[in-house]
Amino acid sequence: MPKQTLDGNTAAAHVAYAMSEVATIYPITPSSPMAEIADEWAAHGRKNIFGKTLQVAEMQSEAGAAGAVHGSLAAGALTTTFTASQGLLLMIPNMYKIAGELLPCVFHVAARALSTHALSIFGDHADVMAARQTGFAMLSSASVQEVMDLALVAHLATLKARVPFVHFFDGFRTSHEVQKIDVIEYEDMAKLVDWDAIRAFRQRALNPEHPHQRGTAQNPDIYFQSREAANPYYLATPGIVAQVMEQVAGLTGRHYHLFDYAGAPDAERVIVSMGSSCEVIEETVNYLVEKGEKVGLIKVRLFRPFSAEHFLKVLPASVKRIAVLDRTKEPGSLGEPLYEDVQTVLAEHGKNILVVGGRYGLGSKEFNPSMVKAVFDNLAATTPKNKFTVGITDDVTHTSLEIKEHIDTSPKGTFRCKFFGLGSDGTVGANKNSIKIIGDHTDMYAQGYFVYDSKKSGGVTISHLRFGKQPIQSAYLIDQADLIACHNPSYVGRYNLLEGIKPGGIFLLNSTWSAEEMDSRLPADMKRTIATKKLKFYNIDAVKIAQEIGLGSRINVIMQTAFFKIANVIPVDEAIKYIKDSIVKTYGKKGDKILNMNFAAVDRALEALEEIKYPASWADAVDEAAATVTEEPEFIQKVLRPINALKGDELPVSTFTPDGVFPVGTTKYEKRGIAVNIPQWQPENCIQCNQCSLVCPHAAIRPYLAKPADLAGAPETFVTKDAIGKEAAGLKFRIQVSPLDCTGCGNCADVCPAKVKALTMVPLEEVTAVEEANYNFAEQLPEVKVNFNPATVKGSQFRQPLLEFSGACAGCGETPYVKLVTQLFGDRMIIANATGCSSIWGGSAPACPYTVNRQGHGPAWASSLFEDNAEFGYGMALAVAKRQDELATAISKALEAPVSAAFKAACEGWLAGKDDADRSREYGDRIKALLPGEISQASGEVKDLLLDIDRQKDYLTKKSIWIIGGDGWAYDIGYGGLDHVLASGANVNVLVLDTEVYSNTGGQSSKATQTGAVARFAAGGKFTKKKDLGLMAMSYGYVYVASVAMGASHSQLMKALIEAEKYDGPSLIIAYAPCINHGINMTYSQREAKKAVEAGYWPLYRYNPQLAQEGKNPFILDYKTPTASFRDFLMGEIRYTSLKKQFPEKAEQLFAKAEADAKARLEQYKKLAEG
């Protein structure tokens, strides 16, 4: 049986592909890779056990995927799907149907937390526990090897039992963990298949040659009996699963049972658990048993149907106390599901055993051997705590167990490494390659696990790698490391990088610093650790190499090469060969240029790696005096700072609000300093157009106006020039960047229209101190009121952006649109945001990029789910309209009351203009100013009325409702709701950030994806044309619709936004957003949008129903006949060139079709414009 190094998702996909004929799919983290892998294999013609290629169909949602599974099963095809979290919840209605009809299938679930008070993409069992009542059998895998083996068990057992299965494993901890495992080959799987059961399944299919009816409506006289008729199948299922497990054991030599026991044969204290925790608990149990403790573990494999007989069979007779661990929370219940099952079994069978239950690991919270020890210690207590939590500090309801002892249970001889990377720098990908190289080319076992934060890029990634001669069960993070690598120098001093490094260990740093500079650059505590632990210290300037070669910020291959050179895991010459082989495999479809650059990176890394010889005096390095910290809000000190220092696990429950509310305007405190280069203003070249500010994805560069008198005390480097324009006469102008908030994308410099660029990119290190002082001075300047037209680029950019310093990718094409909307309407905006990229860069705790102006006003932002965002926003609009109507009623009554003439005039003005933003604000401000005096003079009912108006005064200014999301939401999963909301006529504004892929889940195709584009779920290129969402919305006749592209036309974008917001009805703005998933250089993302329009790839138009009411043509075509080559545009993006490289004939056909579709679309729009 061959060994391969792969992750849990790949293991599941390997089996599902073999055993299925059809897969209906939809992306959701962390299950998406299963579907992506299946789609890619199908695109390349891989055969399953039936000798056929799996038919893969992407659906519009998980509900659609489950419905298609149901239909495919009903028609006689063995069908599977892959999902997690909210996706599984959307499948539940169909799961009841599939189970009720006894249709055999397997849903593979990378178990993940559900959205409650907050979204979490990380792992626990909340989703699968929500599906436990559907009638699906539920089989749990604890490791990557188990995923391979038990996936096969599930597929084999469902055929025999006719009961459908959920095969689940922990999201990220198992789905993304890389392990060296035995791979079951397809011909061996086929030998175990019950072919008679497959034939019987097909004979039961819907077939007009042998028709039958299913899915009837039943009355009270027979429904109950029919429901009970399936009992024998569920009673037989545990025995069938046990039988199949024995069959698989005969093939693999690995024995599984419905419940497996590990530990002392005479154990008195036992933990019952399932999922990856079992690996941690078993490792700990082995450690404790060696020390003489009578402890054990029962691993739950088959959770549904729960077999009391099989559970009791493995329970040692000596057991006195049991702790049941659940990785889910059921508020209001007497206990979590597994706990209640165990209690029931023991009570029904008269077992006098004390049982306590506890929760652990919610949202991928760390669960390690020290915590396992705490659970066993609790069981040993005189009165064990019940309904406990472990892994957190609960200082509110005091459920948590104390961790009294920290233990190291991992096998001796295991080499442990930690790598600190920057999101999008390639560190995680390189480490996955390293694991595979070591796993596939040595006799060592290998494990890799990767920790991310939620920033789209630029966040911290920590890779945990283990290698050793013994199997690795350590499904927890490394706290004692042999090697630690820091791939970004900005982490030095920010994080305790060397915490837990072993004496004599290795420290690898990527920095521009020379050996001589290290003494001044490294903090004292780091120098002390290096010297006292006698570390081997290496440095390499990977950024310099990457930039010289042309790889930009991608330092992955360079750092991987450096690792192999110093780690001595395998001979360096062999490692270099394997690295270059992996480069071909990873980047081959991206072209020879990319390949050669990466080959050069390997060679340069070998030459550039330098060992740093440090003085013994570092052992006595003295800490510098702490810098004076400016006064900060309590939230920043107690929540944001600890979380950003990677100390969030230490925060107690009392730190957090129970409803998930977080303050706004907190990203400005992060100061991540992740850019390599930042823009520096050259005032003599600047024409003061403000385009740089407009396109900045992170609002890091802004124009400032100041009165000369206010510049007293400015830093010497704070150079200004006379402001241009009569509106700014007598004022000074400056463009200023926030150096530590800039991500260094370079779009500002690229779009600068000056003959000689007014912005030049310079190394952050060289200018940080100067530009930080300049920025701090600029921010404290008094606000200058100017009358620049806010409907222009220049005027809009003098308004404060109320979206700043988000976690979006450098060069992001989405954020500039939303930032601009906040500059135009932000102080009265309410935003409903669909789950997706924009909810992650816009709403990842603890730092909120939405902020407030100097009056304390700013966007109120909320996110519900992926599929319901339009309805969520519509509900907001209904509520706001209701509140404003109540206010209008009260103000109307005030007109009849004995109030002052001035107050009455203000009320009359407001009632006449309440639906106009400017007028409602003007008269609303008058009412607010007059209210205190009116209230003080009033009495009785009039005073009560005025107090009621005062309570509702927040609704005096007209609110602007915005529904924001990506194309995956608008074109696919949320389209039904979006269509309904647009059809309703409600006064809402919809902004679709169209990246033409599901950007948030990794770049899967949507109905916005263009013909011929290669995306995940469209590995062979997309065959169908892009859905024309705008044209569909125009068909109503009363929806404002615009298609815009910031990089192509600023003026058209400004017109569209202002017209849409002003329009009294639904508006839809579809915005082209270049994305890293397109395979472009994000320094030129704005330029890429311009090219898209010039080539006829993306249309610019506005459809304004208001014009039709004036007797004019409502459709305005804002782009001309293409002036550039459509094909050249496609060849500038890897999402298209990769198809040409892999499938040249197919590419030619699809590219021709895409171009023809674009031309046909333009002709259609021209006809609309002609009326």
Swiss-Prot record:
[4Fe-4S] cluster 1 binds at residues 686, 689, 692, 752. Its EC number is 1.2.7.1. Keywords: 4Fe-4S, Electron transport, Iron, Iron-sulfur, Magnesium, Metal-binding, Oxidoreductase, Pyruvate, Transport. GO terms for molecular function: 4 iron, 4 sulfur cluster binding; iron ion binding; pyruvate synthase activity; thiamine pyrophosphate binding. Residues 677-706, 733-764 form the 4Fe-4S ferredoxin-type domain. CDD domains: TPP_PFOR_PNO, TPP_PYR_PFOR_IOR-alpha_like. It catalyses: 2 oxidized [2Fe-2S]-[ferredoxin] + pyruvate + CoA = 2 reduced [2Fe-2S]-[ferredoxin] + acetyl-CoA + CO2 + H(+). Homodimer. Pyruvate binds at residues 29, 112, 1000. This is Pyruvate:ferredoxin oxidoreductase. Catalyzes the oxidative decarboxylation of pyruvate to acetyl-CoA and carbon dioxide. The two electrons that are generated as a result of pyruvate decarboxylation are used in the reduction of low potential ferredoxins, which provide reducing equivalents for central metabolism. Also catalyzes the reverse reaction, i.e. the synthesis of pyruvate from acetyl-CoA and carbon dioxide. Appears to function physiologically in both directions. The oxidation of pyruvate by PFOR is required to connect glycolysis and the Wood-Ljungdahl pathway of reductive acetogenesis. The lineage of its organism: Bacteria, Bacillati, Bacillota, Clostridia, Moorellales. It comes from the Bacteria. Its cofactor is [4Fe-4S] cluster; thiamine diphosphate; Mg(2+). Binds 3 [4Fe-4S] clusters per subunit. Binds 1 thiamine pyrophosphate per subunit. Mg(2+) binds at residues 967, 995, 997. [4Fe-4S] cluster 3 binds at residues 809, 812, 837, 1075. [4Fe-4S] cluster 2 binds at residues 696, 742, 745, 748. One of its GO terms (biological process) is electron transport chain. CoA binds at residues 424-428, 456, 556, 598. PANTHER family: PYRUVATE-FLAVODOXIN OXIDOREDUCTASE-RELATED.
